[in-house]
Each structure stands twice: as structure tokens, then as C-alpha cells.
């Protein structure tokens, strides 16, 4: 819960400032536009914006004090007074902000589960939260599709919020009696120290494939960022997908690792594996074995990667002490996650599957998963984001051509880039570019596919998933793949 504490106590042991003992802090805010009278403004030097530029604006809005990032070590601990408002400077504020916020916002009895990896974070966090609810406890999520309880998610700007938002949200969820919270932990969030002070009852690694190289530079640096969840944070259990090459290496290094695999394995001391996996229209059935004993798990999900997601969620809950028989009895009630391999179908029409796949690996796994269920032709409709890693554009096109029967190239979020040039990059990955359909309007792209597809065909509409917007030329407009699918198939929302 949130409590008001003195600035002196809040900043201890980083700064000794007894002169600020009378300044009470009850709310921290990094966005000067959201400052209200009595709020304490945090002026952080971010990756793009220097929050110190907005100190005057925050004071004008009624900030009772400012905690600002110092220019250097010499300025650490200095205090300025601006319009009677104290501004205290801390060196490396970005590195200790999570811990500072943790001293203000507390949630003593809640267990945290951190999920990291390129793909699968949203699905696993939501499966965990659903499952915990089905067996009678209360769980929330924090991540891409929002923060809160699954029936009342609040929109989130980033996969992993800033250090203050995270602590504030966790305290709020604890006040609403959340016993567990499953958090998506991005590589950005780990590198920037946003979850530094959190104590995780379990950490989960899904997989590693090409993404965010515009930020990390190399795959090695990207992998190292993910690894810090297990090596530089408090993490009691490490649930690791060892079918991923990187995960297999980590599981051999981490003493608290539980290896999870879709194939029998004897390499790891602690493991849960599938001895048999069956895929059907009704979902996935897994025969499992390992340190938690054996049994059969069935859930109404589609595809091999969802089998991996399901096993990782299952292993996590078993490691936290949930009863195996209770989990097995409720698994059939698990629901597919919004915009994640979400099926839309109408009589005598091709099936449409909406998925968030926006990396080469995710697109490949989505198409492979659907091929098992497809009796006709498999269509791939997708685009690539602007102002992001351009190297993956031809890679994704090559995957779509290789694994799909029909390829439709469209726009994702072009942002400030010319959509024509983005598609040109994608076409470079095709061996037969003349056979691809180019339709920049996503709604029209799906309309074209549905008009030309047979009832036994499956159309994968990839890239946006749960999102209900599109970004082009600096403008955010309303658009939803899910709404497009429902409208074109004549389904009610």
C-alpha cells in the first residue's frame, strides 16, 4: 500500500538530506504533464527525453518537490530551491529509481512472476493469471495488453512500464487483493533497471529470436539483457524453455533452473517434459513427465508454440506449489489470449486467425502451427513496422513465401517511413515477388483474401493482434484486425 514518507527517509541510503525531513512524499511522477498539487516530480534522463527540461513546468503544476538526475558525481546530493520548491540531485538516478519507488509503494504479501523472451510473454502471463483464478486464487497481469485483472485491463504504454509505474501499479493491485501478479519483463525494462528492486517468486524464459536490434545492436547483447532477469535480480525459480538453444545453455548455468521441453530430456537435474503431444481442432493434449510426476494436460489452444507456452505456465505454477490435480482439472477451461492465434470463423468462409506475430520467429511459428490445421491453402497477410529493425523485413517475407501458399503484403505501423519503401524491403526477400499481392490497406487486404480464399483455407492476419490502432505519419488512427475479421465475416463483436 502507499504511504506518505519524508523525503529524507525516501532517499536513504542514497542521499543524506535531513533538511528535507519535513517534505512528505505520497506520489511520484515522471511525466510532468501528469503532475498534480502535492506530487513529487522525478526528472530522469531517459533514452530519448531529458526530464530535467520539465522541472519548471512540474513546479508550476504544483509539485511539492523534485528528485532529479545529477549531471555527475560531484552534483550528487546537492539541493536547489526553485520557487520555494526543493530540487534534490542524485547521481545515476535511473539505476536506483526502482528501489526508491519500492520504498514508497509496498505490496508485502504478493508473489511476482516475471516472464521474459522474444515471443510468448503475453500468452504465458495471461495463461498463468487465468489458471490461478480457475484454482481459486486472485492474479493480475502487467504487460503488452494492459495492467490489472484480466476482466478489467488498463491500457499500458509499454510492455514493461517505468520504474515508478510498476511499483505504483503493484501496490494498487495488492490493495485490490491480488495474491499474484505475472509481469512481462522486456529487455528494455531489464537494461534500464525498471524492475531492479522486484523480488520474483519465479522467472520464465520463453525463447530468443531477432527483435529490438535497433536498440541492443547485436543478438548477444539482446540475450545478455534477458539473462539479467535470472542473474542480476532476485528470482527464486528459473523456468527455462530448453528447446530454445539459448535457454538450454542458460539452464545448465543456473542452479535454480527447471528445464521445460516438448521432448523427453535427461540432461537437466530438474525438468518437466512432454513425452507425447497431440494437436487437434479441440486443442492441445500433452502427456508429460519429469520432476513433478506424470500426467495428461489438455487445453483449447492451437499450435506447437502454444504447447510450449502451456508447459511453461504449468511448470511455473507447479514450482510455486499449486496442486497438480487442480491444475489438470481446470486446464480445459483456459481461453486463448486476445489477439494471440485468435480464431474467427463463419459458415462457408475461410477461417481467419489474428495473431500478434511481428518477428521472423513468431511468423514462422504461427504459420507452422496453422499448417497442421489447414486442409486447403494457407494465406499470410502481414506487414513490417516503420522506424524499426529493417533487416527483418526480407526475412519475414521469405518465411511467409516458404511456409504459406498465398502471400499478401500490407502495412503494419509505418510510423514516419514511406509504406511503399517498407514493402519494397519485404519484396526483396521473395523468390517470386510478382506472385505476392500488395495491398497497403489492412482491411482491404483481408477483404481480398476472403473473397479469393476457399472455405477450407486459413488466413493468418499477423502483426497487430490485440492492437486497435495504426501509426502513420506521426498520427495514431483507430484500426483493429479483430474488428476487421468480425466485420468481414459478419460476426457480432
UniProtKB/Swiss-Prot annotation:
Carboxylation is probably crucial for Mg(2+) binding and, consequently, for the gamma-phosphate positioning of ATP. The keyword Glycoprotein does not apply. It is found in: Cytoplasm. The modification N6-carboxylysine is found at residue 226. UDP-N-acetyl-alpha-D-muramoyl-L-alanyl-D-glutamate binds at residues 30, 32, 158-160, 186, 192, 194. Its EC number is 6.3.2.13. ATP binds at residues 117-123. Meso-2,6-diaminopimelate binds at residues 388, 412-415, 463, 467. Pathway: Cell wall biogenesis; peptidoglycan biosynthesis. Its cofactor is Mg(2+). GO terms for biological process: cell division; cell wall organization; peptidoglycan biosynthetic process; regulation of cell shape. It catalyses: UDP-N-acetyl-alpha-D-muramoyl-L-alanyl-D-glutamate + meso-2,6-diaminopimelate + ATP = UDP-N-acetyl-alpha-D-muramoyl-L-alanyl-gamma-D-glutamyl-meso-2,6-diaminopimelate + ADP + phosphate + H(+). A motif (Meso-diaminopimelate recognition motif) lies at residues 412-415. GO terms for cellular component: cytoplasm. Keywords: ATP-binding, Cell cycle, Cell division, Cell shape, Cell wall biogenesis/degradation, Cytoplasm, Ligase, Magnesium, Nucleotide-binding, Peptidoglycan synthesis. It comes from the Bacteria. One of its GO terms (molecular function) is magnesium ion binding. PANTHER family: MUR LIGASE FAMILY MEMBER (PTHR23135), UDP-N-ACETYLMURAMOYL-L-ALANYL-D-GLUTAMATE--2,6-DIAMINOPIMELATE LIGASE MURE HOMOLOG, CHLOROPLASTIC (PTHR23135:SF4). NCBIfam families: murE, PRK00139.1-1, PRK00139.1-2, PRK00139.1-4. Belongs to the MurCDEF family. MurE subfamily. This is UDP-N-acetylmuramoyl-L-alanyl-D-glutamate--2,6-diaminopimelate ligase. The lineage of its organism: Bacteria, Pseudomonadati, Pseudomonadota, Gammaproteobacteria, Vibrionales. The gene is murE.
Amino acid at each position: 500500500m502507499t504511504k506518505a514518507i519524508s523525503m529524507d527517509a525516501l532517499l536513504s541510503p542514497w542521499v543524506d538530506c535531513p533538511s528535507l525531513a519535513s517534505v512528505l512524499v505520497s506520489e511520484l511522477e515522471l511525466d510532468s504533464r501528469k503532475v498534480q498539487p502535492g506530487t513529487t516530480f522525478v526528472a530522469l534522463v531517459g533514452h530519448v527525453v531529458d526530464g530535467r527540461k520539465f522541472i519548471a513546468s512540474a513546479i508550476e503544476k504544483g509539485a511539492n518537490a523534485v528528485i532529479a538526475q545529477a549531471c555527475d558525481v560531484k552534483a550528487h546530493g546537492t539541493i536547489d530551491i526553485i520557487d520555494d520548491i526543493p530540487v534534490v540531485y542524485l547521481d545515476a538516478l535511473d539505476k536506483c529509481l526502482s528501489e526508491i519507488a519500492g520504498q514508497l509503494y509496498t505490496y508485502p504479501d504478493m508473489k511476482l512472476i516475471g516472464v521474459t523472451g522474444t515471443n510468448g510473454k503475453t500468452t504465458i502471463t495471461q495463461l498463468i493469471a487465468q489458471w490461478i483464478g480457475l484454482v481459486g486464487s486472485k492474479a493480475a497481469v502487467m504487460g503488452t495488453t494492459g495492467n490489472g485483472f484480466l476482466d478489467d485491463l488498463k491500457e499500458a504504454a509499454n510492455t514493461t512500464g517505468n520504474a515508478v509505474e510498476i511499483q505504483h501499479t503493484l501496490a494498487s493491485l495488492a490493495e485490490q487483493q491480488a495474491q499474484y501478479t505475472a509481469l512481462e519483463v522486456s529487455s528494455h525494462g531489464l537494461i534500464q533497471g525498471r524492475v531492479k528492486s522486484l523480488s520474483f517468486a519465479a522467472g520464465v524464459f520463453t525463447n530468443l529470436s531477432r527483435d529490438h536490434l535497433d536498440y541492443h545492436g547485436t543478438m548477444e547483447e539482446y540475450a545478455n539483457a534477458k539473462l539479467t532477469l535470472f542473474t542480476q535480480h532476485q528470482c527464486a525459480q528459473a523456468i527455462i524453455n530448453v528447446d530454445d538453444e539459448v535457454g538450454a545453455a542458460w539452464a545448465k548455468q543456473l542452479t535454480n533452473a527447471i528445464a521445460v521441453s516438448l521432448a523427453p530430456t535427461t540432461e537437466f537435474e530438474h525438468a518437466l517434459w512432454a513425452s507425447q503431444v497431440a494437436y487437434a481442432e479441440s486443442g492441445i493434449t500433452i502427456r508429460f513427465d519429469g520432476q513433478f510426476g506424470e500426467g495428461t494436460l489438455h487445453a483449447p489452444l492451437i499450435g506447437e508454440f502454444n504447447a510450449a507456452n502451456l508447459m511453461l505456465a504449468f511448470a511455473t505454477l507447479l514450482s510455486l506449489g499449486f496442486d497438480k490435480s487442480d491444475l489438470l482439472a481446470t486446464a480445459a477451461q483456459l481461453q486463448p489470449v486476445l489477439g494471440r492465434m485468435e480464431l474467427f470463423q463463419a459458415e462457408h468462409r475461410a477461417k481467419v486467425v489474428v495473431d500478434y506475430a511481428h518477428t521472423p520467429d513468431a511468423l514462422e511459428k504461427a504459420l507452422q502451427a496453422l499448417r497442421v490445421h489447414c486442409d486447403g491453402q494457407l494465406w499470410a497477410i502481414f506487414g513490417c513496422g516503420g522506424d524499426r529493425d529493417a533487416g527483418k523485413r526480407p526475412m519475414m517475407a521469405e518465411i511467409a513465401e516458404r511456409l504459406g501458399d498465398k502471400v499478401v503484403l500490407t502495412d503494419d505501423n509505418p510510423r514516419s517511413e514511406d509504406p511503399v519503401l517498407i514493402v519494397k524491403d519485404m519484396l526483396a526477400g521473395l523468390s517470386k515477388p510478382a506472385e505476392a499481392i500488395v495491398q497497403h490497406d489492412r482491411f482491404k487486404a483481408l477483404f481480398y483474401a476472403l473473397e479469393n480464399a476457399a472455405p477450407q483455407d486459413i488466413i493468418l492476419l499477423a502483426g497487430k493482434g490485440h492492437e486497435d490502432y495504426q501509426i502513420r505519419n506521426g498520427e495514431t488512427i483507430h484500426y483493429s484486425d479483430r474488428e476487421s475479421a468480425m466485420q468481414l465475416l459478419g460476426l457480432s463483436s
